[in-house]
Every structure is written in C-alpha cells, then in structure tokens.
Curated annotation (Swiss-Prot):
Its EC number is 3.4.11.9. It comes from Arabidopsis thaliana (Mouse-ear cress). Belongs to the peptidase M24B family. Glycosylated. Also present in a non-glycosylated form. Mn(2+) 2 binds at residues 451, 514, 549, 563. The modification N-acetylserine is found at residue 2. InterPro entries: Creatin/AminoP/Spt16_N, Creatinase/aminopeptidase-like, Creatinase_N, Pept_M24, Pept_M24B, Peptidase_M24_C, Peptidase_M24B_aminopep-P_CS, X-Pro_aminopeptidase_P. This is Aminopeptidase P1.
Length: 645
C-alpha cells in the first residue's frame, strides 16, 4: 500500500498544475453503486472493499470516508497509513478539505468519476479559501494500477417483452412527452440501469447487476446508444435498427454530447423513425426551447463540461421514477420470482438445520438448548462461505435464475455485527451452533430481483438476543402494516421501524428500505425509507417496491436484521381525509421468522395475528416447491402461536 500511495503522490506532484490532494471516489463513469472489477479504484488504493466510500490522498495523509454500514469493515481492512472518517459523525469530505488544506490548494479528481452534483458542491466549498477543484481528464490511479483488470466484453442481451412488460417505443413516447413538458430537446442518460431499462437490454458487465456499460441520448426525434460495438451481435443490431436507435462506440459519447450542445447531433435514422414523425408535431415550450436535461446525480462532470450550463436542465432523470413504478407484468414477475426465491431460502434453512444438528450437535431451529460441542471433521465442517454456496446452488435450480443480486452476507456471531460483511473463503468463520447466524441474500431472475434477510439461532439464544430480535421484529411488522396518505415519503415512515428499538435505547446505522429493480439493480431509487434527508425527496407511490429491513448490531457480539420486499398498493380505508387517497404495503417475500427468537409476551394481539397470518400464507404459497421432509419442517416453522405458548 505504501508503494501505491508513494507513486500517486509522485504523479500528484508532477501534474499540471501540481495537486495538493487527490480524491478517489468509489463510482465509475456512470456513478454506479456497484462497479466492475476494472473500476474499483478506491478499493485498489485503500484496500477497503465496501461498496460506498471515498478516499482522499494528500501529501502526507490518507483518509477514507464511509457510512455506518461499513465502519467495522473499514477498521478491519484499512492499514495504519489510513485514517477512517465516519460519515454522519466526522466532517464531510469537502468540509475537511476546506478546513485542513492550504489556501489556493489544488484538489484533483477524475472528471469521469465525479457527478455534476458533487463537483459543483465541492467547488462552492473550496471557493471559500480560493481552493480549486481540478477535474483531471485522465485518472492518476489507472497510471499506477499496472494489474488493472481488462474491460468486460459481455454481449448486449435483449430483455424480452414478456418480462419487461412495456415496449421501448412506448417508453420513448412517455419520455418525449416529459421532455416537451420541461421545455427540453434532449436527455443525456448515464445511469447504467436507466439505459438498460429504457432500451429493454441487459448484460453482465457489472457483477450482480445485469447491466451493460453504456450511455444513451434521447432527443425529440432520435435515440442513441453508446457501447463497445464488439458487444453488439447481429441480432442485437437488428433489434436496435428496428427501434430506430443508432448504436455508436462507447468513446464517442463525449464528442456527441458536444454536438448535442450545439444542436448538430444527427441520427441516420432521424428521418425514418416513427418517433421522428411524432416529434415533428411536438412544440417545445417557447420560453426555453433549447434546454438539455441532465441528471446531476448520475451524469459525470466530464460530459457536463461539454454543455452550455445556461442551457442545461439540472434535475433528476425522468427515467428514475418511471423505472421505479412497476408495470403489471413486472409486478407479476417480481412476485413470482420471490415465491421461487422463498422456496430456495426455506430449503436452505431445512438443510442447514439438519447439518447443524448432525455435525455440531445443535439443538436445532426449533429447540432451545446448548450444543453438545460435537466437532465435525476438517473436511465436513461448515463455514460462512460453504453454507452460502449451498444457498446459491438451491437458487440456481429455480426457473429463470441468472445469478446473485449482491454478494451473500453470510455471517456468524460477531461477523453479523458488520452490516455489509462479505465472507472470503480463506478468512471466514466456521458455523457455530451457539451463536446467531444472519443471512442477507438475493438473486437475479429474468422476471425479478430479490432481497431477503433472516436471522436464526440453532442453539439457545440469550434473553438479550431475544429481546433485540423481538424489537427488530416489532419494527419490521410496524412498517409493513403501515397505512399512510398519498404524498408520504420514506423519511416520515422510517420512525415506525425504529421506535421499538428506541424504547430500549437501541438503533441501527443504516436506512430501513430501498427500492428493488425488475431484473436490475437490487438497490433502486429514487425513493427510500431512511433517516437521511434524501428520503424526503420522493414520496412512496403505488406499484413501487421497497424493502423493510430494520436491524440491531452489537460490535464484537452479534447482529440481527429482518428483511422483506414490499409492494406499495392503494389502500381501502373507511374514510378519506382530505381526499388524498391512502396507501399500504403488500409483503411479497416468503420465508418464516424463527419463533424461538421472539419473546411472544412482548407482542401485541395484532402482531401475533399478523405473524400467524403471514406464516399461514408462507406455508400455502411455498408448499408446491417442497418435498415431504421440507414440508414437514415448514409446517412446524409456521405453526400458529399465542401469547401463552
């Protein structure tokens, strides 16, 4: 690591102008949360592998900012050369730089890896001390990274209409209407999942998220896709030709954005497409007829710098909300995917319960007793990785399976307190029947993306562990049972999941819920359920998906999280105050909760009824996928409970 920092500091000194500091973001050219191996620059320089974070290298210091999900992981992975900066507790990176770097300091960042929003915010902060943000045109990290992985060459795959549910031409029509409404003549699309959604295409360029490295531009009469043409088969080319989409090289996007700015970007299909004929009838609002729509959160500064800032509409992409509002076909597919996925999770729990009893002498999923301290042989012992591999194999046997939706968080004991723990084969823990086991996992299916967390104990949980699990469960149920007026955002609802924990002075450092894509990214906006102010931006709306995942974590001891995916539906209420209309949630995740971890005396009658109803549905819905042994286990796991049980 010292050699990497030393090499970067040499490049910083020789840069023109010389750099006093270098920022290395987590994001790629598309501001993605999950990036390809080739784009993990921040991980390369720091050794920290979490999905969120930012590295800052000065002449004498190296600091890494990350959020509460990764505090423990960062402490474990960072060398002594690095200082951990805790987001939400320590100063923001721009505040720290403004306060600690000298006046007129030059602060460098790759202009392709920083968003318009971030670059503008930093620029304003630095101006207080005449500091300058230097957006470099080449990435200094790439010059140091001699073993950088090659570019991904996975093919562009057309996503069938039977799963997408809405044609590209209809999406074009909707978006062009929004362009007209905003007085814009074009939209620059940088987010990978937005490009995939708009053109009904998928790929495997990024692990766990079925997207292709590509940009897009949509105007009132043309459509462009910027992708490495070697990824586009003859069949895919025919598909794009039929849509009137011009395919250009990935690297052409920056010159074409400059052409777009001067209204000189012309498609060879422009005069042939139905979209063009429709566009001739569209009258752009005369007061601002020349604006270009750019999402400041997903568009990189490199592209934005080619535009006339006076003629740019900086606001969230219209695709983000359209993608979040699932069509009927997507909703049906997501629900079906969660049924198959739930079956795999239950089959996994049945297998794991049997293995823990057989190999470790555990009392098992249903009984409370300390293990007999039986030890398996070296070849038969279970680890966090070997058991998660079993779960993946069970998922892989299900129809339409295409891979995992994120690295499985298979965590025992103190590892479960690391919120986004990722076990490695060489350095993972062995399963322990006397410790809590947390498994947060998900999969990609052609008809939907899944995300589920269950926490279990195969021995005798302590009273404190039960107390904490029960509080998490009560918050999970409270949020899932909420009814609320239309226009309500996730910031308002977040307290429902935390209140039972707050009663004991407990809390958790992550958000409570995120949107889930339709065979796309497992983390999807623009909505969320969270304590963070950004959760105020977009209200929850019918047909959105959102997770319900409160938790509690004790460093060095254990972690608990429960997670289901919910669909937002219209609610039938007795009254309709303010004529707003009301919404409610529908659970679409199916796997039992471990009753022996719940203090039933702490549950209300409503919570008991909800648990019994959910378990009854769970049993009936998953029954067709179970063999006799699995069905017997599931029946036992979903038996009705009462306060006196």
């Amino acid at each position: 690591m010292s050699e990497i920092l030393s090499s970067l500091r040499s490049l910083m000194a020789s840069h023109s102008p010389p750099l006093d500091a270098l920022v290395v973001p987590s994001e790629d050219y598309h501001q993605s949360e999950y990036v390809s191996a080739r784009d993990k620059r921040r991980e390369f320089v720091s050794g920290f592998s979490g999905s969120a974070g930012l590295a800052l290298i000065t002449k004498k210091e190296a600091r890494l900012w990350t959020d509460g999900r990764y505090f423990l992981q960062a402490l474990q992975q960072l060398s002594d050369e690095w200082t951990l900066m805790r987001m939400g507790e320590d100063p923001l990176v721009e505040v720290w730089m403004s306060d600690n770097l000298p006046e007129e300091a030059n602060i460098g960042v790759d202009s392709w890896c920083v968003s318009v929003d971030t670059a503008n915010r930093w620029g304003k902060s630095f101006a207080k001390k005449n500091q300058k943000l230097i957006t470099t045109t080449t990435d200094l990290v790439d010059e140091v990274w001699k073993s950088r992985p090659p570019s991904e060459m996975s093919p562009v795959v057309v996503h069938p209409l039977e799963f997408a549910g809405r044609s590209v031409s209809h999406k074009f029509e909707d978006l062009r209407a929004k362009l007209k409404q905003e007085g814009a003549r074009g939209l620059v699309i940088a987010a990978l999942d937005e490009v995939a959604w708009l053109y009904n295409i998928r790929g495997t360029d990024v692990a766990y998220c079925p997207v292709v490295h590509a940009f897009a531009i949509l105007t009132t009469d043309s459509a462009f896709l910027y992708v490495d043409k070697k990824k586009v088969s003859d069949e895919a080319n025919s598909y794009f030709n039929g849509l009137g989409v011009e395919v250009r090289e990935y690297t052409d996007v920056i010159s074409d954005v400059a052409l777009l700015a001067s209204d000189r970007l012309i498609s060879s299909f422009a005069s042939k497409t139905v979209q063009h004929e429709a566009a001739k009838d569209m009258e752009i609002d005369s007061d601002q007829p020349d604006r270009l729509w750019v999402d400041p959160a997903s568009c990189c500064y490199a592209l934005y710098s080619k535009l006339d800032a006076e003629k740019v509409l900086l606001q969230p992409s219209p695709i983000s909300l359209s993608k979040a509002l699932k069509n009927p076909v997507e909703l049906e597919g997501i629900k079906n995917a969660h049924v198959r996925d739930g079956a795999a999770v239950v089959q996994y729990l049945v297998w794991l319960d049997n293995q823990m009893q057989e190999l470790y002498g555990a009392s098992g999923y249903f009984l409370e007793a300390e293990a007999s301290k039986k030890k398996p042989s070296e070849t038969s012992k279970l680890t966090e990785v070997t058991v998660s591999d079993k779960l993946e194999s069970l998922r892989a046997s299900k129809e339409h399976f295409r891979g995992l939706s994120f690295p499985t968080i298979s965590s025992v004991g103190s590892n479960a307190a690391v919120i986004h723990y990722s076990p490695e084969p060489e350095a993972c823990a062995e399963m322990d029947p006397d410790k809590i086991y947390l498994c947060d996992s998900g999969a990609q299916y052609l008809d939907g993306t899944t995300d589920i967390t269950r926490t279990v104990h195969f021995g005798k949980p302590s009273a404190h562990e039960k107390e904490c699990y029960t509080a998490v469960f009560k918050g999970h149920v409270a949020l899932g049972n909420a009814r609320f007026p239309k226009g309500t955002n996730g910031y308002t609802l977040d307290i429902l999941a935390r209140a039972p924990l707050w009663k004991y002075g407990l809390d958790y450092r992550h958000g409570t819920g995120h949107g889930v894509g339709s065979y796309l990214c497992v983390h999807e906006g623009p909505h969320q359920v969270s304590f963070r102010p950004s959760a105020r931006n977009v209200p929850l709306q019918a047909t959105m998906t959102v997770t319900d995942e409160p938790g509690y974590y004790e460093d060095g001891n254990f972690g608990i999280r429960l997670e289901n995916v919910l669909v937002v539906n219209d609610a039938e209420t007795e009254f309709n105050f303010g004529d707003k209309g009301y919404l409610q949630f529908e659970h679409i995740t199916w796997a039992p909760y471990q009753v022996k971890l719940i203090d039933l005396d702490e549950l209300t009658r409503e919570e008991i009824d909800w648990l019994n109803t959910y378990h009854s549905k769970c049993k009936d819905i998953l029954a067709p996928f179970m063999n006799q042994t699995e069905m017997e286990w599931l029946k036992k796991a979903t038996e009705p409970v009462s306060v006196s049980a």
